[in-house]
Amino acid sequence: MSVSGFKRIALLAPLVAVMALSGVRVFTQEDVQPVNDGPNPYRPIRNWGILPEGRQWGPVSGIDIDRDGKSVWVFDRCGNSCAGSNLDPVLKFDESGKLLKSFGAGMFAWPHSVHVDRDGNVWVVDARLTTPAELKKFPGETVKGNTVVKFSPEGKVLMTLGKSGVSGDPPAAFTDPNDVVTAPNGDIYVSESHTNLESTPNAVARISIFDKNGKFIRSFGKLGSGPGEFRTPHAMVFDSRGRLIVADRANHRIQIVDKNDGKFLGEFRDFSRVSGLVIDKDDTIFAIDSESDAKRHPGWRKGIRIGSLRDGKVKFFIPGHQTDSPDGAAGEGVARDAAGNLYTAETTVRGVTKYVKN
């Protein structure tokens, strides 16, 4: 039996037509057996990337590849957060791990994701506000966060979406944004929110679209587990057909929606509780699960699941890191360079891991 060769049972009535049109099967969570094994064609290189002397990695969740196909951009949390820090959180490394440039000191509260657009500009997401505890710990610090910032490759601020230090609704503000991605036509997509759903039952869960100049177009999505609903839309990418692929993390699925209005097109559940995504030109999907454990997703292991977006089947599995915790650890962000190497942004073991094909 293949790693995805388990019995599947489709959802009933209203989704059948959608499934037929999209060519994507839809399943309930209970129908899917854990996919925890498979060939692993990669070997890990831990602690990749050389920081200046005296600086240590913080938790990292944002990582992407430069337009050159080999340099790596990382969005580091300056320790545990960037409150009170004078460190640059936006870092660029060459393919050997040498630090080429850095910028962004004093601008962010809690760095979360980074996206490099087709012109080489660097977009970053500051995912929450500075906390009262951080303000108390660092006198003179101000409330920051809840913004999406577009930098030139040299570090010049080109655009800011949302108002730093404010929570709210687009277009004026964001509430705990997760990710940003740009469409082929330059439209900007921002997903919210990263809120703890157990303590915030009425959290927002939406994706907003802005045009290339930052003008608000529309938002779609709401909190829920049905078609077109989200529970922590943690990461987004576009596939070769221009569909928006969403890591609907707390719903334990990858959801496929129309990029214009969020119409549900399909879902896959074999990739587990996905925090980060990358898709290659052949629609091979690399999905990293940083959170599965006995409480949040029983029976599933942390790691990277690799498969086809065309059929939703997992073909390869890279297990998470061994740690003192029985559940181990895996990163939140994942990126793939032109040579096929993978890079993961590590929140638990910190820093960056590079995966090279054997």
How should these model regions be labeled?
Residues 22-358:
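Eukaryotic scaffold repeat domains enriched in small/polar residues
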Residues 1-13:
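Bacterial N-terminal signal peptides that target proteins for export
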Residues 12-22:
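Bacterial N-terminal signal peptides
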